Swiss-Prot record:
Binds 1 zinc ion. Residues 158-178 are annotated as: Disordered. One of its GO terms (molecular function) is metalloendopeptidase activity. Transmembrane segments: none annotated. It comes from Mycolicibacterium smegmatis (strain ATCC 700084 / mc(2)155) (Mycobacterium smegmatis). Its cofactor is Zn(2+). This is Endoribonuclease YbeY. InterPro entries: MetalPrtase_cat_dom_sf_prd, YbeY, YbeY_CS. Single strand-specific metallo-endoribonuclease involved in late-stage 70S ribosome quality control and in maturation of the 3' terminus of the 16S rRNA. PROSITE patterns: UPF0054. Gene3D superfamilies: Metalloproteases ('zincins'), catalytic domain. Keywords: Cytoplasm, Endonuclease, Hydrolase, Metal-binding, Nuclease, Ribosome biogenesis, rRNA processing, Zinc.
Length: 178
């Protein structure tokens, strides 16, 4: 799986964290492991330009998704197996997201992770134009974000335990050579 991030926003964000959450969602949604995704982080002016050009709406927004390939389960009928697909581009605006994060009472990192999940789901065909679609998409978005956070917490604790074990073993005389 290839996930590229281009940060043109001027904000210092954790690109590895964005890649981690995108990869987690793509894997959880059973997308082919050779799928490709591009993420671009823009400043408010550039995002406002995209928002007007593609959605005919003024001002910046938090996230926009641009699907690349038409996704078909299993690929072509005559294909031996599904091949890699370019899912598309997710465009994030950290400046706009920072304002939303402040209103919601959480960090910019949390908001960008949420928006990344949202963007990937759009690339996979989910939408929230209708109330039923919104309910389904937002519930899945919340579930995936919670699972990713739990996965990150578990990995953090495992790393800390490994470090404690290593320090303990380093102090032990049991493993010294005779």
């Amino acid at each position: 799986m290839s996930i590229e991030v281009s940060n043109e926003s001027g904000y210092d964000v954790s690109e590895p964290e964005l890649i981690s959450v995108a990869r987690f969602v793509i894997e959880k949604m059973d997308v082919h492991p050779a799928a490709e995704l591009s993420m671009v982080l823009l400043d408010s002016a550039a995002m406002a330009d995209l928002h007007m050009r593609w959605m005919d709406l003024p001002g910046p927004t938090d996230v926009m998704s641009f699907p690349m390939d038409e996704l078909e389960p299993g690929g072509r009928p005559d294909a031996p197996e599904p091949g890699p697909a370019m899912l598309g581009d997710i465009v994030l605006c950290p400046e706009f997201a920072e304002q939303q994060a402040a209103k919601a009472g959480h960090s910019l990192g949390h908001e960008l992770a949420l928006l990344t999940v949202h963007g990937v789901l759009h690339l996979l065909g989910y939408d929230h134009a209708e109330p039923d679609e919104e309910k389904e998409m937002f519930a899945l978005q919340r579930q995936l974000l919670e699972e990713w956070v739990a996965d990150q917490v578990e990995a953090y604790h495992a790393d800390r335990q490994s470090e404690k074990d290593r320090r303990l073993l380093d102090k032990s005389r049991y493993f010294d050579e005779p």
